[in-house]
Design a protein with these regions (language model features):
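Amide-forming acyltransferase catalytic core, primarily the GNAT-like/NAT-type
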Residues: 1-48
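Conserved aromatic-histidine-acidic binding/catalytic patches
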Residues: 3, 69, 137
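Long, highly charged amphipathic alpha-helices
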Residues: 14, 76-80, 144
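Short secondary-structure junctions
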Residues: 25-28, 43-45, 111-117, 157
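Conserved donor-binding loop and adjoining core beta-sheet/short helix segment
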Residues: 28-100
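Hydrophobic alpha-helical segments and helix pairs
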Residues: 92-150
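Conserved small/polar residues in nucleotide/adenosyl-binding loops
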Residues: 151-158
């Protein structure tokens, strides 16, 4: 069985080479994101057979990130994750799979998997100028949130 472990800062040097091999522009493919969200989403990780494997498990929910590393090890990694799910008696599912990553899965396992897009999990992209000004209806909530933060968070001068 795969030995997943809690993500720690000390893992950064070991994990980064695998993440660097990805053609992924998602925040999910960065160590900072993996480390920062690992406590909230119960994310654990390990390096197995030339791939970085990540798992999120909360209660009965179990899901894997797309294995990171050299594509030649992808089939072995996915097979290992699938077996891990069977041993845990859970449905096999992956999260944050890009269309390009899904195409790789489809090459190895034709017709075996389906992709389901969940807009709530998408990364947000903003225009820097509009975000800096926070003008308009679209940014009204963000402007209120920022102003509220400015009221409730004392400046560094006031903290001493």
């Amino acid at each position: 069985m795969i030995n997943f472990r809690k993500v720690e800062l000390e893992n950064q040097k070991a994990y980064k080479p695998y993440m660097a091999q990805q053609q992924c522009r998602s925040c999910e493919c960065t160590f900072a994101n993996l480390y920062l969200w690992s406590r909230f989403y119960a994310v654990t990780a390990t390096v197995e057979n030339g791939m970085l494997l990540t798992k999120s498990e909360e209660g009965y929910y179990l899901s894997y990130g797309f294995p990171m590393g050299k594509p030649k090890y992808l089939k072995e990694a996915v097979d290992a994750l699938y077996e891990y799910s069977k041993e845990k008696k859970r449905k096999f599912q992956m999260h944050n799979v890009t269309p390009e990553q899904f195409a790789l899965l489809e090459e190895i396992y034709p017709g075996r998997f389906q992709i389901e897009y969940r807009r709530d999990y998408a990364d947000y992209v903003y225009e820097a100028e509009k975000l800096a000004k926070l003008s308009g209806k679209k940014y009204h909530g963000k402007k209120n949130h920022t102003n509220l933060s400015l009221i409730h968070i004392p400046s560094p001068r006031d903290r001493s």
